[in-house]
Amino acid sequence: MRNKKTLVVMAGGTGGHVFPGLAVADALKEQGWAVSWLGTADRMEAQLVPKHGYEIDFIDIAGIRGNGLKRLLMAPIRIIKSIWQARSVLKKRRVDLVLGMGGFASGPGGIAAWSMGIPVILHEQNAVAGLTNRILSLFSKRVLMGFSGAFKSGKAILVGNPVRKQLVDLPVKKISSEDVALKVLVVGGSLGAKVLNDLLPAVFSSFDNENFNIMHQSGEGHYQAVQKGYEQRLVKANVQEFITDMASAYDWADLVICRAGALTVAELAVVGLPAIFVPLPHAVDDHQTKNAQYLVSQEAAVLIAQKELTAKKISDYLRLFLQNRKLLTAMSQKSRKAAIIDATESVASICNQLV
């Protein structure tokens, strides 16, 4: 006889899906749940999830939108195959509940669970629900939102975006005083951002080295180019391919220059960190711009569309913040006020209600 409730988390592709899933998984594991993962073997979750102590099963599925006619025509066959693969996994795991957090595996996994009578909880991190989640919401017992308005359905519940406990536990942000260097963190997401990698070394070269302390996450495969960009301009910067301890990086920084993935926006709010957002222009339904607007509307961040991005625009903002730390402090306080810090607990509680 089983004593533990069993959960399969379906989340993958990017850190924006995986890390919120891990936050909920950790919370439920502490409560005695048995948690495993469903994902794809060629995406981030394949390496990241086992490192955090969770078993992962794989199904064969890839994105459909914007990937050409051949893939579109083959999609029904691939989807049916992946649903049967997911059914096999769920049967083997003797699952009580599945939690869909986004990524390629969520759709087939959610439909497989529904077909087996296993309750599905869906969480949409972005301000605009993606295609997979719009479909999966029809098969879900609970539909949860990171941002208000992501779903038009009246049954959708606003819970916020789960973030890691170590971020919630960070002390209240204190912005550096004007007599010391401004600490700037540049993050292009887990995969990097070429436009930030290319532009920021030139931007910082227009200031004295004493003005800024710089930490720059280049993304996988871009370290050497970014490091060279700073060195050629005689700019001191701590360049890292991937920052493994993001809690310490957030705690260190006064300001972030970054994309506007849902997880990034949620994390910045929780830690009270002002931001210059440069949303990914190719994001489906322009959801990153809508994510960023949440903090911009609270006067906790500023936004520069990539098509309007210039070295001068970023330099002007940096000069403003360099000379006006009170403004950054006010933005920090407004950011923290906008945070939903109990999102992880809310999702975990809803999981417990259904089993």
Swiss-Prot record:
Indicate yes or no for the key word Cell inner membrane: yes
Q: How does this protein lie in the membrane?
A: Peripheral membrane protein
What are the annotated GO cellular component locations? plasma membrane
Reaction catalysed by this chain? di-trans,octa-cis-undecaprenyl diphospho-N-acetyl-alpha-D-muramoyl-L-alanyl-D-glutamyl-meso-2,6-diaminopimeloyl-D-alanyl-D-alanine + UDP-N-acetyl-alpha-D-glucosamine = di-trans,octa-cis-undecaprenyl diphospho-[N-acetyl-alpha-D-glucosaminyl-(1->4)]-N-acetyl-alpha-D-muramoyl-L-alanyl-D-glutamyl-meso-2,6-diaminopimeloyl-D-alanyl-D-alanine + UDP + H(+)
Presence of the UniProt keyword Membrane in the record = yes
Which of this chain's residues are annotated to bind UDP-N-acetyl-alpha-D-glucosamine?
T14, G15, G16, N126, R164, S190, I243, A262, L263, T264, V265, A266, E267, Q288
Query: What HAMAP family does this protein map onto?
Result: MurG
The molecule here is called UDP-N-acetylglucosamine--N-acetylmuramyl-(pentapeptide) pyrophosphoryl-undecaprenol N-acetylglucosamine transferase
The organism named in the record is Psychromonas ingrahamii (strain DSM 17664 / CCUG 51855 / 37)
Gene symbol of the encoding locus: murG
